[in-house]
Each structure stands twice: as structure tokens, then as C-alpha cells.
Amino acid sequence: MKTSKTKTPKSVLIAGPCVIESLENLRSIATKLQPLANNERLDFYFKASFDKANRTSLESYRGPGLEKGLEMLQTIKEEFGYKILTDVHESYQASVAAKVADILQIPAFLCRQTDLIVEVSQTNAIVNIKKGQFMNPKDMQYSVLKALKTRDKSIQSPTYETALKNGVWLCERGSSFGYGNLVVDMRSLKIMREFAPVIFDATHSVQMPGGANGKSSGDSSFAPILARAAAAVGIDGLFAETHVDPKNALSDGANMLKPDELEQLVTDMLKIQNLF
């Protein structure tokens, strides 16, 4: 979020459901997020996935797919005036998704996939690369450089300013801590901000991968705590998944915040910014 340590003009807020469940569900969540979207201190993006291609189980809900999913995101964009983030898992999806999305996100498990990074970077969308749960934060500079050199071959090394100018961001979402658990090393925020703007993913950071018999679990009560800590360290924005009924969400319900909980969290974080 925007503090003295934040170099972007506004604090980025990326919020929305994990996966597209229906257009009605998207509209419901988008409506609840209007107070945050209208906050002049925030640069707001609505997020949702058209396909969750890395679900633990084959039986788990993945989403409506590329074509139908993008149609629904385009509807939200037109009806609410929101900028859009969605993630892509395969190279061929990038150019199609970029017709709707303002940010294309590369999932954490795919953060080293050169072909995917290159295809996404050839679009006009901002590139948001999630740090893999298995990655040394210092090594994310090489993923950033793949994107930067795709956009400008003259770039030899990644810097914060160069990445900001060329629309290449990183996203911290925790590191593997034994089996079925994650921990956030707050030092990674400072490390990665040496070579790119950094978004903190508060809700995936509290995930417990594969912790619910073929599904991931988590504890959303820790998300505000980690987000406040990240804001104090210094970040460029917040990523948080939200749902009107997390317990019945079709993906990552245990991690998600209700819209009113997210609004309170953002209010608290904006107060923290004023301390620096």
C-alpha cells in the first residue's frame, strides 16, 4: 500500500473472487466492492479466474473456461467501469485474455515458465508474476528480466523504476513451510522491491495447500494480520480474494474475506501508511 516506501502514485488494490462461479455472483461481489473502487487513494482492479488449472483434485470446480469467462469479465468491466485482472496458464491464452484484462497474472507455480512470460509480456497488459512458493525472492529478478527484455531488448538488469515503467510487477503469496503450510518472510518484500513493484497477496498467503482431503484449506483470520505487517514493511499494493459467502465458495473459500472485512482491512492499512 502507499507509504513513504511506496513509489507508485496510488496504492493498488486487486480484489474479487478466486474463480468465476456465475455472472450473478460476479455482479454481487462487484457491487459490494464499489466503496473501495471509488476510494481516491486506491488504484482498483477487479479480479477473477476463468479457469483454475492447478486445482488439487480432478473433481474440483475449475471455472467457465476462457471464452465464457472473458465474456463475463467484459460485462463486469462495462457495467461497473472496473479495470480487470485475470490469470493465464497457457501461452495461447495471453493475447485473447489481454483483449479484456488490464493485468495478466502468471500463477505462482508457473513463475519460471519462459514461454508463458514472453507471451504475456508481448501484450499491452501489465504483467503480474506471482512468486512461487518454492522460490528464493532474489531469484524472481530473472522472471522480471524475462518480461522486461521481451518489452525492451536494451534492458540488461531489472530495477524498480524500469519494471514500473514497463508494467512488470511481482506478487508475494507466501513460501512453503513443511508440508501443507505456508509462511510469509516479510524480508522478501524489501528484497523484491529492489527490482520490481510488489503486491502482497494476503489471502493466498494464509492457504494450507492440500490441507482438506483433496482441496486446499486455510485460515482467513490471519490475512488482516499479515496484510498490516506487509503495509508497515512497504508494498505497492494489496491482492485479496473476497466473496459474499466464503463458506460456500467453489474455490479457496477458507482463505477469502467477506467484502466488509476487506473494507475494514483496507481502512486499517491506509491508517498504517500515514505513520511512515
From Swiss-Prot:
It is found in: Cytoplasm. Transmembrane segments: none annotated. It holds the Pfam family DAHP_synth_1. It comes from the Bacteria. Its EC number is 2.5.1.55. It catalyses: D-arabinose 5-phosphate + phosphoenolpyruvate + H2O = 3-deoxy-alpha-D-manno-2-octulosonate-8-phosphate + phosphate. Disulfide bonds: none annotated. GO terms for molecular function: 3-deoxy-8-phosphooctulonate synthase activity. InterPro entries: Aldolase_TIM (IPR013785), DAHP1/KDSA (IPR006218), KDO8P_synthase (IPR006269). Keywords: Cytoplasm, Lipopolysaccharide biosynthesis, Transferase. Its main location: cytoplasm. Belongs to the KdsA family. This is 2-dehydro-3-deoxyphosphooctonate aldolase.
